[in-house]
Every structure is written in structure tokens, then in C-alpha cells.
A protein has these predicted regions:
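Short beta-strand-centered segments that line the small-molecule binding cleft or hinge
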Residues: 83-98, 106-118, 187
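Periplasmic-binding protein-like
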Residues: 116-124, 188, 192-210
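Short helix-initiation/N-cap motifs at beta->coil->alpha
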Residues: 59, 74-85, 164-178, 189
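Alpha-to-beta junction loops
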Residues: 34-35, 69-72, 89-97, 139-140, ...
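A structural signal for short loop-to-beta-strand junctions that line the ligand-binding cleft
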Residues: 25, 57-58, 106-116, 202-206
Length: 210
């Protein structure tokens, strides 16, 4: 069955006729199961809970979609780099993720309206004096590889910026907490979660990326 190629962050349809999308939806209903990709390690949107099941905001949205369609839900945990390939190879029908839209991605997928008040930004100690990408020279910047933050910062960071790419959100968070990087580039909800979990961590939004 062809993938319905949907992003829920920011329901998107694969580039093509609406009649094709309707046929793909019919396939999902006939199969009685919808395969939805969600973040494998990106709290609060998706992560493995203490009960051994995936939980989070995106997981809840996936459950609502399956219930609304009246089909069984098959959750497929993915990393940031796996999201588009899993759609393109029909491993999943939909992807629900905090993924920013850009012209390159829009060539193969359509984005829904954003479902959460989410933005990407640079976060660091309140005492670190930076306010734009131009101020990153000489600093170590941690982010998750293959994300929109990676694409945007690779273009805008000045010479002398050390961009350190990690395999998943958990590793990126850990690097910032341990002092391995000076600046954390991620979503505002991730930064808010870090502050909540670490009351002594005095971090601030330095600038917005997307």
C-alpha cells in the first residue's frame, strides 16, 4: 500500500491528486490498521515510558487519529533521520512529529497546520552573551543531526562555530547538561522540559531559528 505521506506538525499529503490520497485512505480503512511514526526519544512528544510503552503528545495524537478512523494503531518509533525515508519507502502511512517545513521537504510532502505552539531556537546559560547566529563563532553548538535546526544552522552559522551533531534528542540534551556543548539548538518544549527537570539550570532563549 502506498504511503499516505502525512506530517502532523507543521496532516500533510504526498504531492499528487486528491483522488490518489482518497484511494490511499481507503486502503488504510480496508486494512484495518494505520501505521504511524512517532519520535522514539523526544519527550514530551514521544518516548518509551516506564511501563515499556511509548507515550507523549504525538503518541496521543496518533491514538486519536486511529480512533477517529476506527482502525487499529501500529506505532512505529523513528529517529529524526528516519522520518522522511520511512514515508518514502511506505514503512509508515503517517508521521506525527515536530518537524519544520522548508521548500526542499515540500517537494515530496505536504505539511498540515501546526498542532502545537512549537519553535526552534538556540538556548544557553543566561549569562552567555549571544543574540544571533553571528555570535556563535568560537562556541560549541549541540543539535540533533538531520533536523530542521541542523539544516538552518549549517547555513547561518559563521566560520569558527563548532556544530556537534548527535544521533537523537536524548544525546543532545545530555551533552548540554554535561557541559560538552555551550549552546543547545532544539525546540522550545525541549528546553522548557530541561528547565523543569533541572531547577538549578538557568537557561534562556537566545534567538529563534524557525
Amino acid at each position: 500500500m502506498k504511503s499516505l505521506k502525512i506530517w502532523l506538525s507543521g496532516l500533510a499529503l504526498s504531492i499528487g491528486a486528491a483522488t490518489t490520497a482518497q484511494a490511499e485512505l481507503t486502503d488504510i480503512l480496508s486494512a484495518g490498521t494505520v501505521k504511524i511514526a512517532v519520535p522514539e526519544n523526544f519527550p514530551p512528544f514521544g518516548a518509551l515510558g516506564i511501563e515499556g510503552e511509548y507515550e507523549g503528545y504525538d503518541v496521543d495524537v496518533a491514538k486519536l487519529i486511529a480512533a477517529d478512523l476506527g482502525v487499529e494503531l501500529e506505532l512505529v518509533p523513528v529517529t529524526s533521520k528516519q522520518r522522511i525515508p520511512f514515508l518514502e519507502t511506505d514503512k509508515v502511512d503517517l508521521v506525527i512529529a515536530t518537524m519544520g517545513a522548508n521548500p526542499g521537504r515540500a517537494k515530496s510532502i505536504w505539511f498540515s497546520s501546526a498542532y502545537a505552539p512549537f519553535f526552534s531556537g538556540a538556548f544557553a546559560a543566561r549569562t552567555l552573551d549571544i543574540s544571533s547566529p553571528a555570535d556563535l563563532a568560537g562556541l560549541k553548538v549541540g543539535l540533533t543531526g538531520g533536523t530542521l535546526e541542523d539544516l538552518e544552522l549549517t547555513e547561518s552559522a559563521p566560520a569558527g562555530t563548532e556544530i556537534i551533531r548527535f544521533g537523537d534528542n536524548a544525546a543532545t540534551r545530555a551533552a548540554f547538561l554535561s557541559g560538552q556543548v555551550d549552546v543547545l539548538v532544539t525546540g522550545n518544549t525541549v528546553a522548557a522540559g530541561l528547565s523543569e527537570e533541572n531547577p538549578d539550570l538557568d537557561i534562556a532563549t537566545k534567538f529563534i531559528i524557525k
